[in-house]
Amino acid sequence: MYLRKFFLLIAVSLTVLSLQNSWSQKAIAKGLKEITPEKIKTHINYLASDALLGRDTPSPGQDSAASYITKAFVQYGLAPVNGSYLAPVPLITTSLGDDNQLEVTVRGVTKNLNIKTDFIPFETSSSGSIEGNVVFAGYGITAPELGYNDYFGIDAKGKIVLILTHAPREKDTTKIFNKYKSLAYKVKNAITHGCTGVLVMTDPLNHMILSPKGFPWPTLYKNFPKEAVALTLKDTAQKKIPLVHVGKELMNILFGSVDSLKSLETLIDNELKPRSKEYTGITIKLRVNTIENRLKTSNVVGYIAGSDPKLKDELVVVGAHYDHVGFMKQHKEGERYIFNGADDNASGTSGLLAVAEAFSKSKVKPKRSVLFIAFTAEEKGLYGSQAYVQNPLFTLSNTVAMLNMDMIGRGNPDTLHLEAGALSPDLTAIAQKENADIGFRIQVDGTEFLDRSDQSSFYHKNIPFIMFFAGLHPDYHTVRDLPETIDTLKASKIARLVLKTAWTVANDDKHYKLIESK
């Protein structure tokens, strides 16, 4: 009797599971039919139209794009978050003031260096004056797992730190220092060691052009557009310190000659042993004068609450950036001057809208919650996605996956790239499985584009991701990236694959492997 009840219970459970799977399949089938080349084309034709003037951040054209996306989310029945479909992203523009100075005093003899030829502030520099002793901290790297620390044996606290660009053994194909090469990392590391300012020199051993670059401030370059001011994210501006790029003149003063510095680098490269040192009898006085103005732009968000009592607190993010690079202020009469950005990234934004609509039309709601985000300011430095992960609308630790669409409308009609797919093997496997009846030849690429789109911000917060990407083309960031060049059939097929992948993830209870960012 008990055995009969047991088998009856199993039969009922299997029937329920079968019905649930049937409902789910019907729901996804209806959603797939909602994604058509015609709908993709309609979205792209508006977002990449001349009227929006390239959707620069910030601009009236970009505001129009945000309004279009907002209206679509409202039409699809997606919910706002915290009462709004707009999530503000505070940006700061920075221009260079008049009073910028760099003085070097060697045993009582002072030399004034010249802005532009000898030093140029970076756009991420703070404004202010500092004076103090100098420490040379090599490449500015602390890599305990490699047994390498440029700060070993020196005290940078309260001093001005001098560092090289790039990393030891730059030509080594293993690239073991790759993740330590960025200026952002080096400045953060210098601040951790208590410095008051940072001077950056181009590595002369592997690079011929040693003149300072910093930022191409319009006041320093006659042919540079006056509107081309530096843009940074307000939330990252709190930890700024004076930061300038210096040239050969300071190398000669501090090292005797450029060749002497090259010899020092060669020793570091050969032995992987830092040659950092504190200078005695040498002080530097630095003044950086920058002027900041605050700007407003927004990510556009739409939300579908999960249906499962336990899983609804977990979140799947589906994203695409909706900004582009604007238009040329100076141009000849009759020539094209608008960077329409049809593929980059009106195509991905259109895919985002298509997937959002498909989800909304489903009568079966996902178990996990889903947040659709159209990111702003990707072209300026991934600022929209950075702002989100710094101030997330939902607990970041509950975000199980981020699916990103960037440039999904060009290239071979049968080929799809999953960028850096090996870093999220479980999600990549799901996408490959869901592709079975769509039929792309999927290429799981390396990490070349990992930090070039919005998935990067999530990856560096240890969130598994997929970047759906159709590939680069000669019209990338040119005035030729136009709506008529888009393969809307391919874009719609990629959007269907994103839908299927997102649906599977949103109805799963698993957590996915990530080869983590350190």
Regions found by a protein language model. Name each.
Residues 112-113, 228-262, 375-474:
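Metal-dependent peptidase/peptidase-like ectodomains
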Residues 179-185, 189, 205-206, 326-427, ...:
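Acidic/histidine-rich catalytic neighborhood of metal-dependent amide-processing enzymes
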Residues 53-169, 297, 422:
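Noncatalytic luminal/extracellular "stalk/propeptide" segments of secretory-pathway proteins
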Residues 1-27:
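Bacterial Sec-dependent N-terminal signal peptides
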Residues 22-80, 249-253, 257, 313, ...:
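N-terminal hydrophobic or amphipathic helices/low-complexity stretches enriched
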Residues 114-233, 305, 337-340, 344:
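Extracellular/luminal Protease-associated
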Residues 26-28, 105-112, 116-149, 153, ...:
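Soluble metallo-hydrolase cores and metallopeptidase-like ectodomains found primarily
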